[in-house]
């Protein structure tokens, strides 16, 4: 009987955590759960998703005139909805500019072919693209990486290691961190929605954040800066994307770690594999919004000159790769 009750309690705890994960996702993507200021993120997410689908169509090797008509019309509706929204000023102007430039290229490509798209993109929508800056969105030529750049990238990747010995007297500048974040924003994301967010803490705030993470014992007190990576769930749609925050946030985090290393900083990945109760404690302590999913923590700083790092032996590529017939 004791074994049965223990099994029952374990199952209950498991399903409860799954339910709380699902509830956060559901509440974050449900328009009725969002206030006016937060709901504009949903419109922005629709705009990004729609213009990026059109961008992909513009890059297809066999251009098909009139492609994506439903997506183009949807983008126009979303942009008009944003114009009427009381919190429209909160929308990322860069993403809106990309949408305008994409519509402009779509119009110009068809005009050059003499293909009539007035039923898809009528003249009364001209204000949406006529002042767009070419190159802000749409398509561009692809530039392969030069061999020297590939060698430099390999050196960055192979030399990166998890640093746990920091110079506690030095804290990275905001400019250095933002330069790394700017590079990390080049990471892939579903339909280019770019849901990754960061929360940066130093001093006592960094130590407060670390107190909720169990993997920094013995060195956490020497970490001068903590970066919490999250994913903004408001930009996702439907249950099929319920794991996308972790996927996109993970890719962003990896590129951020490489970028920090390239900036001459040391960093250590601190996992956030916790239950929702511990997650709640961190959120309350450092004010992370309910609609953001915590992906991981990163301890960051200048590496100690005499510090050591683990060898961390890696599997061979041949051990993990399989090739289809």
For the regions a language model picked out, list residue spans one by one.
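Acidic, surface-exposed loops and disordered segments
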Residues: 1-325
């Amino acid at each position: 009987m004791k074994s049965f009750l223990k099994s029952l309690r374990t199952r209950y705890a498991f399903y409860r955590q799954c339910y709380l994960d699902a509830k956060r996702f559901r509440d974050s993507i449900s328009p009725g759960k969002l206030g006016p200021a937060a709901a504009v993120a949903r419109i922005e997410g629709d705009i990004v998703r729609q213009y990026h689908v059109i961008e992909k169509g513009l890059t297809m090797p066999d251009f098909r005139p009139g492609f994506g008509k439903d997506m183009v019309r949807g983008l126009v509706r979303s942009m008009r909805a944003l114009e009427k929204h009381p919190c429209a000023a909160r929308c990322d102007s860069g993403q809106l500019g990309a949408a305008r430039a994409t519509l402009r290229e779509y119009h110009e490509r068809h005009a050059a072919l003499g293909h009539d798209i007035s039923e898809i993109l009528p003249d009364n929508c001209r204000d949406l693209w006529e002042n767009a800056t070419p190159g802000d969105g749409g398509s561009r030529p692809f530039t392969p990486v030069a061999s020297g750049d590939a060698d430099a990238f390999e050196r960055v990747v192979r030399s990166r290691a998890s640093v746990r010995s920091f110079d506690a007297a030095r804290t990275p500048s905001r400019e250095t961190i933002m330069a790394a974040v700017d590079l990390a924003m080049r990471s892939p994301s579903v339909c280019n929605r770019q849901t990754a967010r960061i929360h940066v803490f130093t001093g006592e705030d960094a130590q407060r954040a670390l107190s909720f993470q169990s993997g920094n014992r013995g060195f956490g007190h020497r970490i001068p800066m903590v970066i919490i990576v999250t994913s903004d769930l408001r930009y996702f749609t439907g249950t099929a994307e319920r794991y996308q925050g972790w996927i996109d946030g993970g890719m962003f985090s990896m590129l951020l770690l490489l970028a920090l290393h390239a900036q001459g900083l040391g960093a250590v990945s601190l996992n956030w594999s916790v239950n929702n109760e511990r997650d709640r404690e961190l959120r309350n302590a450092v004010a992370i919004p309910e609609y953001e999913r915590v992906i991981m923590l990163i301890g960051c700083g200048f590496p100690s000159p005499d510090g050591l790092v683990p060898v961390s032996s890696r599997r061979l590529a041949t051990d993990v790769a399989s090739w289809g017939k």
